Amino acid sequence: MKITLKEQIKILQEDGKLPKFSNKKRDFQIVTDENIKKGSIIYIPMINDDGFVVKGNYKSSDKWIVVMGISKDDCIVGSLLVNTKPNTFFKELGDIQFPLLKKDYSFWDYKSWLDCSKLFRIPRLRILQYGGYCGCITDSDWELIWETVKNTDFISDSDKEFFGIL
């Protein structure tokens, strides 16, 4: 009898044997329902359906995201994208690029930047299937990030309400 990948993962998690998600450089814990919460940092292949523009002839691009909120029906996760360089296309956009220091996040190789200008809508099931759990934003960073996202005009109030930010 064949069982699905999701069922296999559930069995392993129930037995206390958390499998690892791996890219070429790192191993991550598989994302569990408990990991999908505000402030979680997840490594996932982003696709066009997430609202992310995949460049070149690729189907996906591996990215770090930070969970900002979850829809009321618990199906869609609102996330911000982490970049290696700040997006400073114009001043207002540069002002909402939040620095994430390597000393606070040991799994990064360098200082990174959280782009607080756009919420990406990623299905919860896709995060559970393909994501790697990395950890959480520090409490001090979270307070500043939350206020930045709550007050930015780059994200619509309806999107903020949809994900419980307002």
Can you describe what each PLM-predicted range is?
Residues 1-14, 18-19, 96-166:
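C-terminal terminal-subdomain/extension
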Residues 17-27:
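Short, structured beta-strand/loop micro-motifs enriched in basic residues and often containing a Trp
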Residues 30-35:
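Short, surface-exposed secondary-structure edge patches
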Residues 38-39:
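Loop/turn positions that initiate beta-strands
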Residues 52-104:
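Compact nucleic-acid interaction/catalytic patches
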